[in-house]
Amino acid sequence: MKAIGSKPVRALPVGARCICADNTGAKEVEIIAVRNYKGVARRLPTARVGDMVIVTVKKGTPEMRKQVLPAVVIRQRKEIRRPDGTRVKFADNAVVIVTPDGNPKGSDIKGPVAKEAAERWPGIARIAKIII
């Protein structure tokens, strides 16, 4: 895991439901925790593009449902402001299920991946078809 150049807005609080954009069998997941989040007392932890989160699978194959797994946020609907002044936002909030060390469990990612997530997680960048 590397540091990222820009600092996107934290837009996904605990409890947010996201699309799972890989071929592991999960379709929809819910964020239940954010790794390495240092916040304020009584404030919900929130995630942004490139963060590792802990998710539970809400919709998917019977083998995947109800499992608690680590995942990385690859897209968010809230716009990301980059250091060069450009702004990027996506049509949905999406995650990719990964191993605890950050390598993707699936072999394919559907849709684009934010540049911030690809820079931070080389394993995700390897299997991404489109990096924006």
From Swiss-Prot:
Please provide, in alphabetical order, the Gene Ontology terms of the cellular component aspect for this entry: cytosolic large ribosomal subunit
InterPro entries named in the record: Ribosomal_uL14 (IPR000218), Ribosomal_uL14_arc (IPR019971), Ribosomal_uL14_CS (IPR019972), Ribosomal_uL14_sf (IPR036853)
UniProt key word Cell inner membrane:
no
SUPFAM superfamilies assigned to the protein according to its UniProt record, in alphabetical order? Ribosomal protein L14
Q: Its GO biological process terms?
A: translation
Cross-referenced Gene3D superfamilies:
Ribosomal protein L14
Q: Name one GO molecular function term.
A: structural constituent of ribosome
Keyword set for this entry?
Answer: Ribonucleoprotein, Ribosomal protein, RNA-binding, rRNA-binding
SMART domains per UniProt? Ribosomal_L14
| Subunit annotation | Part of the 50S ribosomal subunit. Forms a cluster with proteins L3 and L24e, part of which may contact the 16S rRNA in 2 intersubunit bridges.
Family of the protein in this entry? Belongs to the universal ribosomal protein uL14 family.
Instruction: Note the PANTHER family from the entry.
Output: 50S/60S RIBOSOMAL PROTEIN L14/L23, LARGE RIBOSOMAL SUBUNIT PROTEIN UL14
UniProt function note: Binds to 23S rRNA. Forms part of two intersubunit bridges in the 70S ribosome.
Under the heading HAMAP family, the entry gives: Ribosomal_uL14 (MF_01367)
Instruction: Tell me the protein's name.
Output: Large ribosomal subunit protein uL14
Q: Which organism is it from?
A: Methanocaldococcus jannaschii (strain ATCC 43067 / DSM 2661 / JAL-1 / JCM 10045 / NBRC 100440) (Methanococcus jannaschii)
Print the organism lineage: Archaea, Methanobacteriati, Methanobacteriota, Methanomada group, Methanococci
Gene name as annotated: rpl14
